[in-house]
Each structure stands twice: as C-alpha cells, then as structure tokens.
Design a protein with these regions (language model features):
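Active-site- and interface-proximal helix/loop "cap" or "latch" segments in soluble metabolic
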Residues: 1-204
C-alpha cells in the first residue's frame, strides 16, 4: 500500500533520522498536510505516513527535557506495560460501564555496567464509556499522571503527604545505581524502608 514501497517501521525510522540535528523549534514547525503527512519533499521520499502526532510528541519531549543524571554513552531503554482495569464491560438497559486500560511507561538510561543513571516513570488511565444505548464515548484527550501534576489529587491521601508525581520521582531516584537484577528483587509489599520513605505507590 506504500507508494515508496516501505513498511511502517522503515518510514518511522526515516522520520527519526530526518529529525537528527534539528532544534525543538524547527521540529515543531515541520509542515504537514491536512491528513498529517509531511509536505517536505526530502522527507516524503522516505516517509509518507502521518507524522503530525510524532512531530508534536518530539517537540513536547524536548520542552520537558531535564538533566536527571544520564551521561554520554549511556544506553536508553523504554518499557511499556498495559493492563486491563475494567471489571465489567457489559452495558445494560439501565447502566453505563467504563472500559479502562492502565498504561505504565518507564524510560531509563544505564551505564556500561548496566546500572541505572536516570529514570522517569509515568502512567495513563484511558477509559471509554459504553452507554446503555450501545454508543461509546471517549475523552478528547487523556492526561498522564505526571501531566496532571498537583491536580491528580493524591496528596491528601498519601501517608507521606506527596502527590503522585513526587512518589514517581522518589521511586526513579531510588533506582539510580541499581542493575535490572537488583530492581527485579525489590519487595512488592513495601517492606523496603528506604523506598517506603520516598514512595508508597504500587511500583510492581
């Protein structure tokens, strides 16, 4: 189906290569057609998929970037886990139901010894409402817990008096210097006193 005979992965890689050397401002100004596909002829020669969403995500990532401890030569890893958080997705004549998926995202860097040098963790809870009449409603946008910041509303319920993003930051700081094997052995019952002093949310 591709006019340039390339698969999605190849085109996504081509777009990533095209961005190398650009500033965040230049990325944000990349022009696209109404369908999100690029206008630039050079980019079109290797990428014809819609790139507007990826463009905006890259620009946003640049705007949110901060120094967390990574160094030149570190390896970057991304982990994503999705779990069904819906108890029942059968709507009845008198009851609407919500279908929710909990998506956990962790990005980290590790040095040549495999020890974490920086990490950031986030979570999103996108949900659909299945109406009793069979229609399905979805929010226009879903904000992650980090994006919600203080408005997430966890501080009052936290034994540490912390908001969710602060718990996440505490957990990520705790990971620094640890290997994957050491992290995998972390107790899930909150019995690690050092971690419990920083973070009491579920980190499993």
């Amino acid at each position: 189906a591709s006019g340039i005979k390339k698969g999605w992965t190849e085109q996504a890689d081509a777009f990533a290569d095209y961005l190398k050397g650009m500033t965040a401002e230049k990325v944000a100004k990349l022009e696209t057609e109404e369908d999100g596909k690029p206008k630039d002829a050079d980019l079109l020669s290797s990428c014809t998929i819609a790139i507007d969403g990826y463009r905006d995500a890259v620009a946003k990532a640049c705007a949110n970037a901060e120094a967390l401890g990574a160094a030149k030569g570190d390896r970057v890893s991304l982990g994503i886990e999705a779990a069904n958080a819906s108890s029942d997705v059968t709507a009845t004549d008198d009851k609407d139901v919500n279908a929710q998926v909990d998506v956990t995202i962790v990005a980290l860097t590790a040095d040549s010894d495999g020890r974490v040098t920086s990490a950031i963790g986030d979570m999103a809870e996108p949900a659909l409402t299945v109406m009793s009449d069979g229609n399905v409603m979805a929010p226009d946008a879903v904000k992650t817990k980090l994006e919600q910041g203080e408005s997430y509303g966890m501080r009052g319920a936290s034994s540490l008096g912390k908001e969710w993003y602060e718990h996440s930051e505490g957990f990520c700081s705790y990971l620094k210097g640890k290997t994957a094997a050491e992290i995998a052995k972390l107790p899930a019952d909150g019995s690690d006193a050092d971690l419990a002093a920083l973070c009491t949310i579920d980190v499993t």
